[in-house]
């Protein structure tokens, strides 16, 4: 009898347990509508699922930020940063993430020794930086990003992510002064990098070259003479046109300030000596006969300055 009673209690327990599990299941799945179950409320980790393409709402972003701040799991951290970065591409979410205190949470991740996590954090900050109000909070990371860009592996994804963020942060003149001490390093990177790195560095330098307040600093920087190879006719147009625009912008800024390049004293070996020297003049004359119309026009616009 005792054995039968025990078996009966076990059976009852299994039935009750199954019933409780079913209740929890129904609570999380929600009531049926037309024979179909509602999708359950997603947990923070569910929101990092790569297949989740919806734009997150404020409550979901809050969960995601909490997860990002609290987890030590590198896989979850990386997924959370990717999801956050994707959502930061939308203007509404750029403001929401800032208001939720998300920028410092993301910003702290650029200190990660994990290069992939660091890259994803920089990408997220890059998308967030499109919002002007966000830039006031992101600016504190600019000096570190400048240092890291020069220390990161050459032509790496993390280096390009840092350069993209710096490019976004220098679209206006507000924070360009934060890069004043990094100009020489940018020119060095321009000469060492591959095509993708060269293009991204040139985009950044073009932003700086449009600001008259940065002109003297650009012209005074010491640059290797191999810089002039960027003005060779066989250079890819995406690089050549940007290099020509850089020169054109500097000329325009000098004109705006009512100064001629030769009126400003610069040391030998500076960008000034390269741009306004005879070798560069010869290259401009050669480019004035270039087969590409855009290259030809820019070269002709620069040529009269010699």
Curated annotation (Swiss-Prot):
It is a single-pass membrane protein. One of its GO terms (cellular component) is mitochondrion. Its main location: endoplasmic reticulum. The keyword Flavoprotein does not apply. Keywords: Endoplasmic reticulum, Growth regulation, Membrane, Mitochondrion, Mitochondrion outer membrane, Phosphoprotein, Transmembrane, Transmembrane helix. The modification Phosphothreonine is found at residue 48. ARM repeats lie at residues 101-143. It is found in: Endoplasmic reticulum membrane; Mitochondrion outer membrane. InterPro entries: ARM-like, ARM-rpt_dom, ARM-type_fold, Armcx_regulator. Interacts with the DNA-binding domain of p53/TP53. The chain crosses the membrane at residues 7-29. May play a role in cell survival and cell growth. May suppress the transcriptional activity of p53/TP53. The modification Phosphoserine is found at residue 43. It comes from the Eukaryota. This is Armadillo repeat-containing protein 10. It holds the Pfam family Arm_2.
């Amino acid at each position: 009898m005792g054995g039968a009673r025990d078996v009966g209690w076990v059976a009852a327990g299994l039935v009750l347990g199954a019933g409780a599990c079913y209740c929890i299941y129904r609570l999380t799945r929600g009531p049926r509508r037309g024979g179909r179950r509602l999708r359950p409320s997603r947990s923070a980790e569910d929101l990092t699922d790569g297949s989740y393409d919806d734009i997150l709402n404020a409550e979901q972003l809050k969960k995601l930020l909490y997860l990002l701040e609290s987890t030590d799991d590198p896989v979850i951290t990386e997924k959370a940063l990717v999801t956050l970065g994707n959502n930061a591409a939308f203007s509404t979410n750029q403001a929401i993430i800032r208001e939720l205190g998300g920028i410092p949470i993301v910003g702290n991740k650029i200190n990660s020794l994990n290069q992939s996590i660091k890259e994803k954090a920089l990408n997220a900050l890059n998308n967030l930086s499109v919002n002007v109000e966000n830039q006031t909070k992101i600016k504190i990371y600019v000096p570190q990003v400048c240092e890291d860009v020069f220390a990161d592996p050459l032509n790496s994804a993390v280096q390009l992510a840092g350069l993209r963020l710096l490019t976004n942060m220098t679209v206006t003149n507000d924070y360009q002064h934060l890069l004043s001490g990094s100009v020489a390093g940018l020119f060095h990177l321009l000469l060492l990098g591959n095509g993708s790195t060269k293009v991204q560095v040139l985009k950044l330098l073009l932003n700086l070259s449009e600001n008259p307040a940065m002109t003297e600093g650009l012209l005074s920087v010491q640059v290797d003479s191999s810089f002039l190879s960027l003005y060779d006719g066989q250079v890819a147009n995406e690089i050549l046109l940007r290099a020509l625009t850089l020169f054109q912008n500097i000329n325009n800024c000098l004109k705006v300030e009512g100064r001629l390049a030769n009126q400003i004293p610069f040391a030998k070996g500076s960008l000034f000596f390269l741009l306004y020297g005879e070798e560069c003049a010869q290259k401009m004359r050669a480019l004035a006969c270039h087969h590409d119309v855009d290259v030809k026009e820019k070269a002709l616009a620069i040529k009269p300055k010699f």
